[in-house]
Amino acid sequence: MSEAAHSGAAPADLVELGRIASAYGVKGWVKVQPHSAQAEVLRTVSHWWLTRPAPQAARGVVASVPRAYQVLQARVHGGAVVAQLAGIDDRDQAEALRGCLVQAARSAFPAPADDEYYWVDLIGCALYSDADGESRLLGVVDEVFDNGAHAVLKVLRQQLQPGQPGPVPLVDPKGRPLEELVPFVRAHIRHVDLAARRIDSDWPLDY
């Protein structure tokens, strides 16, 4: 990577936000494909931490150590984000970053607006349903994605069972985890308590 990168210790709270897809123009700008629709973080943080992932076919090879680049300018361009990084001054230098994962410190994210949440904060939250009048565990949020209209929670089904110290994962007859896709919209989500790692909804339990 370029000598413009800062090689200090990476923050412990790095969150992967996208991947550098290509160079953009001839003045060293890069184009990033965000992992989610919440690309505003890429535009607002002052530094990106770039990591070159290990080749999937290479055994024993690990990803590179994250290095920080100062973000001089960044803007949305279609479904991507284009940015100018300090020390990256021409297309060749930008192309050398192709494929790098783009991360940022969670502590550097701007505060979300009321009733808005960063997707990364929803992962790991327990989702409960009161569709039948009683609050019951549906499962734990494993992933959040955009279906083009709104965010969707991918929930790994779990159930509280007598005699068990914690929730028990539910599986199908072949032993595969049961999943539920729950729209993350006001019509179904009643309350989000990030401190308690809990989301309450009226999504029906469908055993």
From Swiss-Prot:
GO cellular component terms attached to this protein's record: cytoplasm; ribosome
Keywords: Chaperone, Cytoplasm, Ribosome biogenesis, rRNA processing
Keyword field contains DNA damage: no
A family per Pfam: PRC_RimM
Entry note about domains: The PRC barrel domain binds ribosomal protein uS19.
Subunit structure: Binds ribosomal protein uS19.
Function, as annotated: An accessory protein needed during the final step in the assembly of 30S ribosomal subunit, possibly for assembly of the head region. Essential for efficient processing of 16S rRNA. May be needed both before and after RbfA during the maturation of 16S rRNA. It has affinity for free ribosomal 30S subunits but not for 70S ribosomes.
Similarity annotation: Belongs to the RimM family.
UniProt-recorded name of the protein: Ribosome maturation factor RimM
Species in which this protein is naturally found: Bordetella parapertussis (strain 12822 / ATCC BAA-587 / NCTC 13253)
